[in-house]
Design a protein with these regions (language model features):
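Flavin-dependent oxidoreductase catalytic core characteristic
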Residues: 1-75, 79-369
Length: 369
Protein backbone atom coordinates (compact mmCIF):
# COMPACT_ATOMS: atom_id res chain seq x y z
CA UNK A 1 0.00 0.00 0.00
CA UNK A 2 1.06 3.57 -0.63
CA UNK A 3 0.15 6.67 1.34
CA UNK A 4 0.67 10.40 1.24
CA UNK A 5 2.46 12.03 4.15
CA UNK A 6 2.34 15.78 4.67
CA UNK A 7 4.77 17.66 6.90
CA UNK A 8 3.72 21.05 8.26
CA UNK A 9 6.28 23.23 10.04
CA UNK A 10 8.40 20.20 10.94
CA UNK A 11 11.83 21.04 12.33
CA UNK A 12 14.65 18.62 11.55
CA UNK A 13 17.69 18.61 13.85
CA UNK A 14 20.83 19.48 11.92
CA UNK A 15 22.48 16.19 12.84
CA UNK A 16 19.60 14.33 11.17
CA UNK A 17 20.10 15.88 7.73
CA UNK A 18 20.84 13.17 5.17
CA UNK A 19 22.60 15.53 2.81
CA UNK A 20 22.58 19.31 2.52
CA UNK A 21 19.56 21.48 3.11
CA UNK A 22 17.56 21.93 -0.08
CA UNK A 23 19.30 19.01 -1.78
CA UNK A 24 16.84 16.28 -0.81
CA UNK A 25 15.63 15.80 -4.37
CA UNK A 26 19.19 15.03 -5.45
CA UNK A 27 19.36 12.28 -2.84
CA UNK A 28 16.05 10.83 -4.04
CA UNK A 29 17.10 10.93 -7.69
CA UNK A 30 20.45 9.34 -6.85
CA UNK A 31 18.58 6.49 -5.17
CA UNK A 32 16.56 6.07 -8.37
CA UNK A 33 19.77 5.89 -10.39
CA UNK A 34 21.10 3.06 -8.22
CA UNK A 35 17.75 1.29 -8.08
CA UNK A 36 17.35 1.26 -11.83
CA UNK A 37 20.83 -0.19 -12.27
CA UNK A 38 20.47 -2.89 -9.62
CA UNK A 39 17.10 -3.86 -11.09
CA UNK A 40 18.71 -4.10 -14.52
CA UNK A 41 21.51 -6.26 -13.14
CA UNK A 42 18.97 -8.71 -11.78
CA UNK A 43 17.19 -8.73 -15.12
CA UNK A 44 20.44 -9.49 -16.95
CA UNK A 45 21.17 -12.40 -14.63
CA UNK A 46 17.69 -13.87 -15.05
CA UNK A 47 17.89 -13.47 -18.82
CA UNK A 48 21.26 -15.23 -18.98
CA UNK A 49 19.97 -18.14 -16.91
CA UNK A 50 16.83 -18.41 -19.05
CA UNK A 51 18.90 -18.47 -22.24
CA UNK A 52 21.22 -21.18 -20.92
CA UNK A 53 18.41 -23.35 -19.57
CA UNK A 54 16.19 -23.16 -22.64
CA UNK A 55 19.07 -23.71 -25.06
CA UNK A 56 20.20 -26.75 -23.09
CA UNK A 57 16.63 -28.06 -23.39
CA UNK A 58 16.37 -27.67 -27.17
CA UNK A 59 19.85 -29.14 -27.63
CA UNK A 60 18.79 -32.31 -25.86
CA UNK A 61 15.07 -32.53 -26.70
CA UNK A 62 14.45 -34.48 -29.94
CA UNK A 63 11.57 -34.31 -32.41
CA UNK A 64 11.54 -36.12 -35.77
CA UNK A 65 14.89 -37.67 -34.79
CA UNK A 66 16.50 -34.23 -34.62
CA UNK A 67 17.23 -31.92 -31.69
CA UNK A 68 14.87 -28.96 -31.60
CA UNK A 69 17.89 -26.67 -31.85
CA UNK A 70 18.41 -27.71 -35.48
CA UNK A 71 15.18 -26.04 -36.59
CA UNK A 72 15.70 -22.53 -37.91
CA UNK A 73 12.85 -20.86 -36.02
CA UNK A 74 14.27 -22.23 -32.79
CA UNK A 75 17.73 -21.05 -33.83
CA UNK A 76 16.27 -17.60 -34.40
CA UNK A 77 15.24 -17.42 -30.75
CA UNK A 78 18.53 -18.87 -29.51
CA UNK A 79 20.51 -16.30 -31.47
CA UNK A 80 18.27 -13.46 -30.32
CA UNK A 81 18.53 -14.45 -26.65
CA UNK A 82 22.32 -14.52 -26.57
CA UNK A 83 22.75 -11.46 -28.79
CA UNK A 84 20.38 -9.40 -26.67
CA UNK A 85 22.09 -10.76 -23.57
CA UNK A 86 25.33 -9.25 -24.83
CA UNK A 87 23.57 -5.93 -25.39
CA UNK A 88 22.11 -6.02 -21.87
CA UNK A 89 25.49 -6.62 -20.27
CA UNK A 90 27.18 -3.95 -22.38
CA UNK A 91 24.69 -1.26 -21.45
CA UNK A 92 24.80 -2.22 -17.80
CA UNK A 93 28.62 -2.15 -17.71
CA UNK A 94 28.67 1.32 -19.24
CA UNK A 95 26.08 2.94 -16.97
CA UNK A 96 27.23 1.31 -13.74
CA UNK A 97 30.69 2.53 -14.72
CA UNK A 98 29.28 6.05 -14.79
CA UNK A 99 27.89 5.51 -11.29
CA UNK A 100 31.20 4.16 -10.00
CA UNK A 101 32.99 7.12 -11.57
CA UNK A 102 30.77 9.49 -9.61
CA UNK A 103 28.94 11.06 -12.56
CA UNK A 104 26.04 13.11 -11.25
CA UNK A 105 23.62 13.98 -14.05
CA UNK A 106 22.89 10.51 -15.42
CA UNK A 107 19.12 10.36 -14.95
CA UNK A 108 18.56 9.82 -18.67
CA UNK A 109 21.21 7.11 -18.88
CA UNK A 110 19.80 5.15 -15.93
CA UNK A 111 16.26 5.57 -17.26
CA UNK A 112 17.41 4.20 -20.62
CA UNK A 113 19.09 1.28 -18.85
CA UNK A 114 15.90 0.46 -16.96
CA UNK A 115 13.66 0.68 -20.04
CA UNK A 116 16.00 -1.32 -22.25
CA UNK A 117 16.74 -3.99 -19.66
CA UNK A 118 13.13 -4.52 -18.63
CA UNK A 119 11.90 -4.75 -22.23
CA UNK A 120 14.74 -6.80 -23.69
CA UNK A 121 15.03 -8.95 -20.56
CA UNK A 122 11.35 -9.81 -20.89
CA UNK A 123 11.80 -10.70 -24.56
CA UNK A 124 14.70 -13.02 -23.73
CA UNK A 125 12.78 -14.88 -21.02
CA UNK A 126 9.71 -15.06 -23.26
CA UNK A 127 11.80 -16.58 -26.07
CA UNK A 128 13.21 -19.07 -23.57
CA UNK A 129 9.75 -20.11 -22.43
CA UNK A 130 8.57 -20.45 -26.03
CA UNK A 131 11.25 -22.90 -27.11
CA UNK A 132 10.81 -25.00 -23.97
CA UNK A 133 7.12 -25.29 -24.82
CA UNK A 134 4.71 -26.56 -22.18
CA UNK A 135 7.64 -27.71 -20.03
CA UNK A 136 8.53 -24.06 -19.56
CA UNK A 137 5.33 -23.61 -17.54
CA UNK A 138 6.33 -26.29 -15.06
CA UNK A 139 7.59 -24.85 -11.77
CA UNK A 140 10.38 -27.41 -11.41
CA UNK A 141 11.89 -26.29 -14.72
CA UNK A 142 12.70 -22.83 -13.37
CA UNK A 143 11.54 -20.68 -16.27
CA UNK A 144 7.98 -20.35 -14.97
CA UNK A 145 9.16 -18.18 -12.07
CA UNK A 146 11.63 -16.20 -14.19
CA UNK A 147 8.94 -15.46 -16.77
CA UNK A 148 6.36 -14.43 -14.17
CA UNK A 149 8.79 -12.21 -12.27
CA UNK A 150 10.13 -10.59 -15.45
CA UNK A 151 6.79 -8.98 -16.24
CA UNK A 152 6.88 -6.66 -13.22
CA UNK A 153 10.13 -5.05 -14.33
CA UNK A 154 8.43 -2.84 -16.91
CA UNK A 155 6.24 -1.44 -14.12
CA UNK A 156 8.51 -0.94 -11.10
CA UNK A 157 11.25 1.72 -10.72
CA UNK A 158 9.23 3.99 -12.98
CA UNK A 159 6.98 2.29 -15.52
CA UNK A 160 8.27 2.29 -19.08
CA UNK A 161 5.29 4.40 -20.17
CA UNK A 162 6.52 7.06 -17.73
CA UNK A 163 10.18 6.64 -18.61
CA UNK A 164 9.74 6.97 -22.38
CA UNK A 165 8.33 10.54 -22.28
CA UNK A 166 10.97 11.37 -19.65
CA UNK A 167 13.80 10.15 -21.90
CA UNK A 168 12.30 12.11 -24.80
CA UNK A 169 11.74 15.28 -22.79
CA UNK A 170 14.84 15.41 -20.61
CA UNK A 171 17.12 13.97 -23.27
CA UNK A 172 15.93 16.49 -25.87
CA UNK A 173 15.66 19.41 -23.46
CA UNK A 174 18.62 21.42 -24.77
CA UNK A 175 17.58 21.09 -28.40
CA UNK A 176 13.96 21.91 -27.59
CA UNK A 177 14.99 25.02 -25.66
CA UNK A 178 17.20 26.14 -28.55
CA UNK A 179 14.42 25.65 -31.11
CA UNK A 180 11.88 27.39 -28.90
CA UNK A 181 14.23 30.32 -28.32
CA UNK A 182 14.73 30.82 -32.05
CA UNK A 183 10.99 30.54 -32.71
CA UNK A 184 10.13 33.08 -30.03
CA UNK A 185 12.76 35.49 -31.32
CA UNK A 186 11.95 35.33 -35.04
CA UNK A 187 8.37 34.06 -35.50
CA UNK A 188 5.23 36.14 -35.83
CA UNK A 189 3.15 36.17 -32.65
CA UNK A 190 -0.59 36.57 -33.20
CA UNK A 191 -1.04 37.85 -29.66
CA UNK A 192 1.25 40.82 -30.32
CA UNK A 193 0.50 43.93 -32.35
CA UNK A 194 2.08 44.55 -35.75
CA UNK A 195 4.49 47.05 -34.25
CA UNK A 196 5.51 44.75 -31.41
CA UNK A 197 6.24 41.91 -33.82
CA UNK A 198 8.32 44.13 -36.10
CA UNK A 199 10.20 45.62 -33.16
CA UNK A 200 11.12 42.14 -31.93
CA UNK A 201 11.76 40.31 -35.20
CA UNK A 202 13.78 42.86 -37.21
CA UNK A 203 16.66 43.25 -34.72
CA UNK A 204 16.82 39.49 -34.25
CA UNK A 205 17.11 38.94 -38.01
CA UNK A 206 20.46 40.74 -37.96
CA UNK A 207 21.66 39.32 -34.64
CA UNK A 208 24.84 37.34 -35.53
CA UNK A 209 24.67 35.02 -32.51
CA UNK A 210 21.03 34.16 -33.19
CA UNK A 211 21.56 33.75 -36.93
CA UNK A 212 24.45 31.38 -36.30
CA UNK A 213 22.01 29.04 -34.58
CA UNK A 214 18.94 29.76 -36.68
CA UNK A 215 20.29 29.40 -40.23
CA UNK A 216 21.56 25.79 -39.93
CA UNK A 217 18.33 24.79 -38.21
CA UNK A 218 16.17 26.50 -40.84
CA UNK A 219 18.05 24.92 -43.75
CA UNK A 220 17.58 21.53 -42.14
CA UNK A 221 13.89 21.93 -41.30
CA UNK A 222 12.73 23.69 -44.46
CA UNK A 223 15.31 22.86 -47.15
CA UNK A 224 16.17 19.32 -46.11
CA UNK A 225 19.91 19.85 -45.60
CA UNK A 226 20.90 17.27 -42.99
CA UNK A 227 24.03 18.06 -40.91
CA UNK A 228 27.03 15.77 -41.21
CA UNK A 229 27.02 12.57 -39.21
CA UNK A 230 29.07 12.72 -36.00
CA UNK A 231 32.41 10.95 -35.87
CA UNK A 232 32.41 7.65 -33.98
CA UNK A 233 35.94 6.38 -33.45
CA UNK A 234 37.21 2.95 -32.44
CA UNK A 235 40.64 1.60 -31.60
CA UNK A 236 40.28 -1.48 -33.79
CA UNK A 237 39.86 -1.25 -37.55
CA UNK A 238 37.42 -4.17 -37.91
CA UNK A 239 34.85 -2.07 -36.03
CA UNK A 240 35.01 0.89 -38.42
CA UNK A 241 32.00 -0.25 -40.53
CA UNK A 242 29.92 -0.59 -37.37
CA UNK A 243 31.08 2.81 -36.13
CA UNK A 244 30.00 4.33 -39.45
CA UNK A 245 26.59 2.68 -39.26
CA UNK A 246 26.16 3.92 -35.70
CA UNK A 247 27.13 7.41 -36.82
CA UNK A 248 24.50 7.33 -39.58
CA UNK A 249 21.85 6.19 -37.10
CA UNK A 250 22.68 9.08 -34.77
CA UNK A 251 22.46 11.49 -37.70
CA UNK A 252 19.08 10.11 -38.77
CA UNK A 253 17.68 10.17 -35.25
CA UNK A 254 18.80 13.75 -34.59
CA UNK A 255 17.31 14.94 -37.88
CA UNK A 256 13.97 13.24 -37.36
CA UNK A 257 13.77 14.48 -33.78
CA UNK A 258 13.84 18.03 -35.16
CA UNK A 259 11.45 17.18 -37.98
CA UNK A 260 8.95 15.65 -35.56
CA UNK A 261 9.03 18.89 -33.57
CA UNK A 262 8.26 20.76 -36.79
CA UNK A 263 5.48 18.38 -37.88
CA UNK A 264 3.64 18.32 -34.55
CA UNK A 265 4.56 21.79 -33.24
CA UNK A 266 3.08 22.39 -29.76
CA UNK A 267 1.11 19.14 -29.92
CA UNK A 268 4.28 17.10 -29.58
CA UNK A 269 4.01 17.72 -25.83
CA UNK A 270 0.91 15.48 -25.72
CA UNK A 271 1.80 13.06 -28.53
CA UNK A 272 3.23 10.34 -26.32
CA UNK A 273 3.24 7.75 -29.11
CA UNK A 274 5.64 9.99 -31.05
CA UNK A 275 7.69 10.59 -27.91
CA UNK A 276 7.93 6.84 -27.27
CA UNK A 277 9.26 6.16 -30.78
CA UNK A 278 11.97 8.77 -30.44
CA UNK A 279 12.72 7.57 -26.93
CA UNK A 280 13.06 3.95 -28.06
CA UNK A 281 15.25 4.99 -30.98
CA UNK A 282 17.54 6.88 -28.60
CA UNK A 283 17.54 3.93 -26.20
CA UNK A 284 18.62 1.48 -28.89
CA UNK A 285 21.28 3.88 -30.17
CA UNK A 286 22.69 4.21 -26.67
CA UNK A 287 22.75 0.42 -26.34
CA UNK A 288 24.62 0.16 -29.65
CA UNK A 289 27.15 2.71 -28.41
CA UNK A 290 27.72 0.65 -25.28
CA UNK A 291 28.15 -2.50 -27.37
CA UNK A 292 30.69 -0.89 -29.70
CA UNK A 293 32.63 0.45 -26.74
CA UNK A 294 32.67 -2.92 -25.01
CA UNK A 295 33.65 -5.05 -28.00
CA UNK A 296 36.34 -2.49 -28.87
CA UNK A 297 37.78 -2.86 -25.37
CA UNK A 298 37.54 -6.65 -25.55
CA UNK A 299 39.42 -6.63 -28.85
CA UNK A 300 42.18 -4.43 -27.48
CA UNK A 301 42.67 -6.67 -24.44
CA UNK A 302 42.19 -9.92 -26.39
CA UNK A 303 39.41 -10.95 -24.03
CA UNK A 304 39.05 -14.72 -23.60
CA UNK A 305 35.42 -14.55 -24.79
CA UNK A 306 36.15 -12.31 -27.77
CA UNK A 307 35.51 -14.86 -30.54
CA UNK A 308 32.11 -15.80 -29.15
CA UNK A 309 31.12 -12.25 -28.19
CA UNK A 310 31.96 -10.88 -31.66
CA UNK A 311 29.29 -13.15 -33.09
CA UNK A 312 26.74 -12.02 -30.50
CA UNK A 313 27.74 -8.39 -31.03
CA UNK A 314 27.21 -8.50 -34.79
CA UNK A 315 23.77 -10.08 -34.50
CA UNK A 316 22.65 -7.73 -31.72
CA UNK A 317 23.86 -4.76 -33.76
CA UNK A 318 21.73 -5.80 -36.73
CA UNK A 319 18.67 -6.51 -34.59
CA UNK A 320 18.80 -3.14 -32.84
CA UNK A 321 19.62 -1.32 -36.07
CA UNK A 322 16.44 -2.74 -37.60
CA UNK A 323 14.41 -1.66 -34.57
CA UNK A 324 15.77 1.89 -34.81
CA UNK A 325 14.82 2.15 -38.47
CA UNK A 326 11.35 0.82 -37.66
CA UNK A 327 10.77 3.33 -34.85
CA UNK A 328 11.90 6.25 -37.00
CA UNK A 329 9.86 5.11 -40.00
CA UNK A 330 6.74 5.01 -37.83
CA UNK A 331 7.11 8.72 -37.10
CA UNK A 332 5.46 9.25 -40.50
CA UNK A 333 3.69 5.96 -41.21
CA UNK A 334 1.66 4.90 -38.19
CA UNK A 335 -1.83 4.15 -36.91
CA UNK A 336 -1.93 6.91 -34.30
CA UNK A 337 -5.04 8.63 -35.66
CA UNK A 338 -7.15 5.47 -35.73
CA UNK A 339 -5.66 4.48 -32.36
CA UNK A 340 -6.97 7.62 -30.70
CA UNK A 341 -10.40 7.10 -32.25
CA UNK A 342 -10.52 3.44 -31.22
CA UNK A 343 -9.42 4.27 -27.69
CA UNK A 344 -12.11 6.95 -27.35
CA UNK A 345 -14.76 4.55 -28.68
CA UNK A 346 -13.66 1.85 -26.24
CA UNK A 347 -13.70 4.31 -23.33
CA UNK A 348 -17.25 5.37 -24.22
CA UNK A 349 -18.35 1.72 -24.32
CA UNK A 350 -16.60 1.00 -21.03
CA UNK A 351 -18.41 3.88 -19.34
CA UNK A 352 -21.67 2.07 -20.10
CA UNK A 353 -20.62 -0.95 -18.02
CA UNK A 354 -21.82 -0.96 -14.38
CA UNK A 355 -19.05 0.05 -11.97
CA UNK A 356 -20.34 -2.38 -9.36
CA UNK A 357 -19.21 -5.37 -11.44
CA UNK A 358 -15.58 -4.28 -11.75
CA UNK A 359 -12.63 -3.55 -9.53
CA UNK A 360 -12.14 0.20 -9.18
CA UNK A 361 -9.37 1.96 -7.32
CA UNK A 362 -10.55 2.98 -3.88
CA UNK A 363 -9.47 6.61 -4.35
CA UNK A 364 -11.13 7.10 -7.75
CA UNK A 365 -12.57 10.63 -7.97
CA UNK A 366 -15.15 9.60 -10.57
CA UNK A 367 -16.56 6.29 -9.32
CA UNK A 368 -16.77 3.96 -6.37
CA UNK A 369 -15.93 0.29 -6.54
Amino acid sequence: WQARIRFTNVRVPRENLLHKEGRGLIVALTCLNYGRCTLSAGIAGAAARAADQSTKWVQTRYQFERPLAEFELVQQRIARMYAYGYALDSLLYMVTGMLDRGDTDIMVETAITKVFSSQIGWEIVDDALEIMGGEGYMTENELERLWRDSRIHRIVEGSNEVMQPFIFGYGGKQLAEQMMGIQQAMSWDGDESFGQNVKRIVPNMVNPALLKRAIPLATELFLGFVPSAPAVSTENSWLEPFALRLSKLIQKHAHLFKMASKWHKEEIVIRQAVQARLSDSATFIFALSAMVSRIDSQTSTNDQNLTRDKVYFEHAFELLELRIHQQLAELRINADKSMRKAAETARTYNNSLPNSEYYIHETSPSAKG
